[in-house]
């Protein structure tokens, strides 16, 4: 979405806007504010398509390593995740302005709940129960006809630009293949603290998404 030169500044501006309206002194993370920005834009896309606000359900990947009370071998590999979940409930007042901090709060609360719940996992049975409960909730939401479903994944803070298989470190690392639609993948920019967001949408949705004022402002097109 952004070149590395402008990404950090844009995210800093987003965090400032969100922080101004968040209760308390906490500062949202860059992943939280970028997720919230995209979620807000997607909500506006859905309203443009359907003529009204629609409820939506967000799934965000969450790495369980170092977050659970049972030991995990340092040399373990593969996916060890249980996603954080968040909901947007459409307000009866269709004219009410939907603000960025509204989505930041929901993303933050979903992630904090996953952190809290994961800290209680101390056995294989606890882990199995937690994963099954989350997957069941996801499946139920996915089959709701009146709600939109969005899946987010973040590889931020993974040292992918330090990997060297013998022919040098990568000039650019990306997740080129994103199967399906309503899928969003975050990666660090190479040279700074920015984020690349890979967005996969239906073509009609993508056209509306690209014209969203918040997205255009964030990417320097507004």
For the regions a language model picked out, list residue spans one by one.
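Acyl-CoA-dependent O-acyltransferases
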Residues: 1-222
